[in-house]
Amino acid sequence: MNPNLNIEQDNASEIVAGVDEAGRGPLAGPVVAAAVVVNQSIMIDDIKDSKVLSKSKRESCYDKITNSYYYSIGIASVQEIDKYNILEATKLACIRAVKNLAIIPTKVLVDGNMNFTDNRFISIVRGDQICYSISSASIVAKVTRDRIMQILHKEYPVYGWNQNCGYGTKLHIDAIKTYGQTIHHRVSFKFKGNINHSAILGNMV
């Protein structure tokens, strides 16, 4: 199923923003949310949930989205993830993304089933698969976070973040066991195996 504008068109009197996040599951790096307000007169081909698009297709769609629509980014840091938990940090990133928009939305469609105190926010399960605005936001969030992890990889190359984007691949987990964790790792995240939690690394080359 390709995402469509049915929900947006059902709310034609509203300024509708779609919101999605990237990076809830990784062992390292921030969680990133994007908010997108689409211009319904400009439809971009290939807009789908970012997870089903190739990297090159995501990059191409990202350029078109950011050149055609209002969009913004919200980030919750590793420190906030460890302090509040990943769910609350994700909600924080989503709220920040909406606040950072240059236009104020009157309705906010969010992928998933999170609850927000702001009554503008409406959660839609599998929204990234059915809602064009949310799908657009999923692409912007994913590409933005991947680029952040590319930058962090240059600082700590042994973890392979240029390939795994902080997710728990064998290479990444083995590197944590060998070298310990960095300031960019989520110490609140647990997985099988022994980790040296006290080894906070400086720059590695």
Swiss-Prot record:
Its EC number is 3.1.26.4. CDD domains: RNase_HII_bacteria_HII_like. GO terms for cellular component: cytoplasm; ribonuclease H2 complex. It catalyses: Endonucleolytic cleavage to 5'-phosphomonoester. GO terms for biological process: DNA replication, removal of RNA primer; mismatch repair. SUPFAM superfamilies: Ribonuclease H-like. This is Ribonuclease HII.
